[in-house]
Amino acid sequence: MVQYAANIQDKVFMNMKSNNNLTGYVAINNDLGFFLDAEKFAPLLSINDEASVLLRLSLLIENFLEVFINNVRKPGTEQFVKPSRYFTPKLEICVALGLPLSIANSLVKLNSIRNKFAHKIDYSMTSEDYLEIERSVNSIDINEVNPLEAFNMESLQYMFSAGVDSLMFVKNAEFSMPEKMRRLHRLVGTIYILSNKCAFFTLNELKRQERLSMNKLKD
């Protein structure tokens, strides 16, 4: 099993700290592990089409909003607090439930670029589009998404300091890779990191509510 560190390649199993001060590999007992799973994003690295990659990334990350609502809302409120069909109402509910504004702003940025494709079928992402998304995700602070240290701070630090350059498939990209593919790889990596940060905060919030369930794995 690979340690969750600089390469950020493991999936649901992470080095975490529980209320009982247990350390080591644990399994998260809910559907948030999906957003920490690099294999969900890996197929996108072979797609050489901006619109297709952006749409799939948007759908992956929008699914987080539903998972956040379903996990974080107060038990018994399911009839009244539930995901809408549309992005903006779902995001508004998430913010009302405590989702940090830095994460919300990153989601809005991604959705706004997705909408450019919806309104102009031949739209091409500009360098500024890529940079705006990356800057927005980089602005999400480690203390904001891991306030209760549900995750070991040291194991996360490199990802937060290096950003997308902490990912092996970005660092090890072939020199001869076309610039378009290089930018798409960085986009996939950036949204993967955003997905991780979303999961980090949600798990911290569940810990705050004393509803975080995880089991220590056997050696």
Regions found by a protein language model. Give the residues of each.
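Amphipathic alpha-helical interface elements
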Residues: V2-D219
